[in-house]
From Swiss-Prot:
The keyword Cytoplasm applies. Associates with the EF-Tu.GDP complex and induces the exchange of GDP to GTP. It remains bound to the aminoacyl-tRNA.EF-Tu.GTP complex up to the GTP hydrolysis stage on the ribosome. It comes from the Bacteria. Signal peptide: none annotated. GO terms for cellular component: cytoplasm. It comes from Methylobacillus flagellatus (strain ATCC 51484 / DSM 6875 / VKM B-1610 / KT). Belongs to the EF-Ts family. Residues 82-85 are annotated as: Involved in Mg(2+) ion dislocation from EF-Tu. InterPro entries: EF-Ts_dimer_sf, Transl_elong_EFTs/EF1B, Transl_elong_EFTs/EF1B_dimer, UBA-like_sf. One of its GO terms (molecular function) is translation elongation factor activity. It is found in: Cytoplasm. This is Elongation factor Ts.
Amino acid sequence: MAEITASMVKELRERTDAPMMDCKKALTEAEGDMARAEEILRVRFGNKASKAAGRVAAEGVVAVSIKADGKLGAIVEINSETDFCAKNADFLAFVAQVAEAAATEKPADVAALSALKIDGGSVEDIRTQLIGKIGENITVRRFAVTEAKGKLVSYVHGGKIGVLVDLVGGDETLGKDIAMHIAAAKPKSLDASGIPAELIEAERRVAIEKAKEAGKPEAMLDKIADGTVQKFLKEVTLLSQPFVKDDKQTIEQLLKANNASIASFTMYVVGEGIEKVVTDFAAEVAAAAKV
């Protein structure tokens, strides 16, 4: 059995907010597997234990650029160390230029994007200059280019959430409404086909374990799990979500009423999946005093 260290318990505690002893028990039961331990705690404490999955820590900006005909666009995320840098005029101008370059040139990857020419040099040149000027690390993290089947529509919320939607049919207002909905509801995919099988299976396992602990009959477990999975899919797939401006209809119903469909969408949330290192100032001072 893998050794359960204090740092492992601390990490699981930070991920889930579960009591320390429960974290240790879960890690022991999972034989040190952090993901499995988190799943065990979800069974015991509900979805609160999965809070780390949506925790966002890094700073930066998301920007979108769409060509005039609405047929080609890009969304980019560029990270900085602090929100102060993310509000810097030079930094914001750089992000906008990178988004425009991505939409124009359609680079294959971040390395190719970094080599593109913008005002004053390559993306990498300007990034390096900004680091020297502002004094913070700046990273071109990710981007996506969309060639539309319909027409591209975007929504950016405070530079922190960006959405790019390929809307077939409908009008600009419908597109904006759906893009804003995506930013608010944060669907994982357009429909159930885009949800990874392992994620669905994890939901089934959790549902079955919770049903067992609640004393439900063995014969009912599969039915309960099926219901839980269907509820989960309705919550995380765009077409099944209730429209945020009118929850009496789903996005799918809204689209049908407007003779429209969505070919694809991309959503970026600044820092999604990045954990910022948080310094314990008191511990740092104490450690320094021992030197």
